Amino acid sequence: MSERSYYDILGVSKSANDEEIKSAYRKLAIKYHPDKNKGNKESEEKFKEATEAYEILRDPKKRQAYDQFGKAGVSGGAGGFGQGAYTDFSDIFGDFGDIFGDFFGGGRSSGFGGGRRSGPQRGSDLRYNLEVSLEDAALGREYKIEIPRLESCVDCNGSGASKGSSPATCPDCGGSGQIRRTQGFFSVATTCPTCRGKGTIISNPCRSCGGQGLQEKRRTINIKIPPGVETGSRLKVSGEGEAGPNGGPHGDLYVVTHIKKHELFERQGNDLILVRKISLAQAILGAEIEVPTIDGKKAKMKIPEGTESGQVFRLKGHGMPYLGAYGKGDQHVIVKIEIPKKITRRQRELIEEFARESGENIPGSKGKIFTK
């Protein structure tokens, strides 16, 4: 597949609106349609290129993900345009009836068959946004989540027909779900109006699901969050999506993590940033202090004499773990010298003496130092 951007493939700008994208795709689809260019592999590839680009750019969520992350951001949702994708184009063109209707005589149609397949179909994938604390992202944790999803009706086993009956083959389309006809260069298939593309008709529908074969249920799932996840990490749970029509298999569930803001730590990649206050005496004389770490423990850190406010110290290996790999990032500690707002008389005298020893001239200092 071409490495060109989807915008370049369709010949539109990144700011193109829906109508411009649709119009550009319409022209390319008609020009490179395989039924019009039989045996031409180059046209076939260009047709698939254009279809892949349109499939992403016509969907606001997919387009946003593509604009932000490129093809990597939509690699799981582009419909799979690799080897063997040509035979599955009926799935894609089932959604493109509005484009081809003008050229193929109305209805949801395409040279690849248009309407829905009559046999079992794979269910839709689901997405679940999960908020995760920074501690859980560092250590890993098992979450219990509840999702609404379509499941096969238990009363009819997904057939849509009531007990004691079964779906019958549609007499008009012979079970294909499509009515075919030829127009010029194009072999056009429109959705069968009798069975609405299913290939079967149900004379006695199941009362529980209304003949759909699917019911919405709520399912509780345990999700293991591995150490090192970050905002935008996507965890795939196979077979936990929605059940497919006509007894088809379940799709997949994608859990997308969103890391909550922490009151102490700021995350930068796999490193953690912590601001730690120290006293004036500790900054001048040096000290050994304890700082919190993301695992809930304390780490000892040496403050050398003469430390300045804003100085950064590194605690190696105390950051976030690398997802799916060994090792951790570092924890960077920014020290801030805390100046007392109130001091005792004795402390004032000592500071004034310190100032004189340092050769500092502080006019009118008596009674005014550190008073606010």
Swiss-Prot record:
Role noted for this protein: Participates actively in the response to hyperosmotic and heat shock by preventing the aggregation of stress-denatured proteins and by disaggregating proteins, also in an autonomous, DnaK-independent fashion. Unfolded proteins bind initially to DnaJ; upon interaction with the DnaJ-bound protein, DnaK hydrolyzes its bound ATP, resulting in the formation of a stable complex. GrpE releases ADP from DnaK; ATP binding to DnaK triggers the release of the substrate protein, thus completing the reaction cycle.
Native source species: Leptospira interrogans serogroup Icterohaemorrhagiae serovar Lai (strain 56601)
UniProt-listed SMART domains: DnaJ (SM00271)
Name recorded for this polypeptide: Chaperone protein DnaJ
J domain segment(s): 5-70
Keywords noted in UniProt: Chaperone, Cytoplasm, DNA replication, Metal-binding, Repeat, Stress response, Zinc, Zinc-finger
UniProt free text on domains: The J domain is necessary and sufficient to stimulate DnaK ATPase activity. Zinc center 1 plays an important role in the autonomous, DnaK-independent chaperone activity of DnaJ. Zinc center 2 is essential for interaction with DnaK and for DnaJ activity.
Gene (UniProt): dnaJ
CC cofactor: Zn(2+)
PANTHER family: CHAPERONE PROTEIN DNAJ, DNAJ HOMOLOG 1, MITOCHONDRIAL-RELATED
Compartment(s): Cytoplasm
Positions annotated to bind Zn(2+) 2: 170, 173, 192, 195
